Amino acid sequence: MKRICSVSSVQLFSRSFRALASPRSLNYPLQCIKRSSVRMESSNFSSGVRTESSVKPRGALIVLEGLDRSGKSTQCAKLLSFLNGLGHPTELWRFPDRETSVGQMISAYLSNKSQLDDHTIHLLFSANRWEKRSLMEEKLKTGTTLIVDRYSYSGVAFSSAKGLDIEWCKAPEIGLLAPDSVLYLDISPERAAERGGYGDERYERVEFQKKVADFYQTLGDSSWKIINASDAMEEVEKKIQQVVLDQVKECTEGKPLSLLWSS
């Protein structure tokens, strides 16, 4: 088992984000951010993503979001089985990825084994996604559909619910790949709290989850599909499948990749 990094490692990591976290360094990017906007690239950028009409078929990037205990993990697993059963190469990813060195620090924090400043843990969550960014692009461009259990929206919603500025929270996420579709599993915090295992981790408190839900509503855009997570599990599963199959078809027809929250 990997050893969880020490607090001193967190301090070193946090200092490496000092330029990003300072208001001065964020001044220009924040002027350019447009809420819930995605820029379609028309030429090469540093990671090599292109969006000309000649783009080859690719995998779809499907993100499931929602409050804690909304059923995301269950539906992600069902969707994985469904797509693989249809012959679509598909993988299931989860954020945070607790297997990486950064992910282990996050895991310790979420299980109340360590204490971190709110800004520091937000940047760690963001770094955890950046750790997988190149591999994510590679998988998509070679035809693998990715089902992602939580993505940048969770990071921004949860940190904003703690009182951090929402635009500050979005800034470190700019440049990550934008999902082709976001499926938001909508459930009341009170209903979610009735489900098994609720309260095991730091953020599983009804009043806090209400704040998170409000910020999710702020972040939602045209790529989001709202699914009533209080419906029967089979009904939720069917609705998700319908949305995802449409996206998979578009991506196999050459739908271009795009970037998250870029003007």
Curated annotation (Swiss-Prot):
Induction of expression: Cell cycle regulated. Up-regulated at the G1/S phase transition and then decreases rapidly as cells progress into S-phase. Not up-regulated during the male and female gametophytic mitoses.
Catalyzed reactions per annotation: dTMP + ATP = dTDP + ADP
Tissues with expression: Expressed in root, rosette leaves, flower buds, flowers and siliques.
Gene3D superfamilies assigned to the protein according to its UniProt record, in alphabetical order: P-loop containing nucleotide triphosphate hydrolases
Single GO MF annotation: ATP binding
SUPFAM superfamilies (alphabetical): P-loop containing nucleoside triphosphate hydrolases
Keywords associated with the record: ATP-binding, Cytoplasm, Kinase, Mitochondrion, Nucleotide biosynthesis, Nucleotide-binding, Nucleus, Transferase, Transit peptide
GO terms for cellular component: cytoplasm; mitochondrion; nucleoplasm
GO biological processes: dTDP biosynthetic process; dTTP biosynthetic process; embryo development ending in seed dormancy
Known pathway: Pyrimidine metabolism; dTTP biosynthesis
Enzyme's top EC category: transferase
Any one Pfam family match given in the protein's UniProt record, by short name: Thymidylate_kin
Cited InterPro entries: P-loop_NTPase, Thymidylate_kin-like_dom, Thymidylate_kin_CS, Thymidylate_kinase
Disruption phenotype: Embryonic lethality when homozygous, due to arrest of the embryo sac development soon after fertilization.
Residues annotated as transit peptide in the record: 1-51
Enzyme Commission no: 2.7.4.9
Binding positions (ATP): G66, L67, D68, R69, S70, G71, K72, S73, T74
HAMAP family according to UniProt: Thymidylate_kinase (MF_00165)
Protein family membership: Belongs to the thymidylate kinase family.
Known role: Catalyzes the conversion of dTMP to dTDP. Involved in the regulation of DNA replication. Is essential to promote the first division of the zygote.
Protein name listed in UniProt: Thymidylate kinase
The organism's taxonomic lineage, starting at the top: Eukaryota, Viridiplantae, Streptophyta, Embryophyta, Tracheophyta
Gene from which this protein is expressed: ZEU1
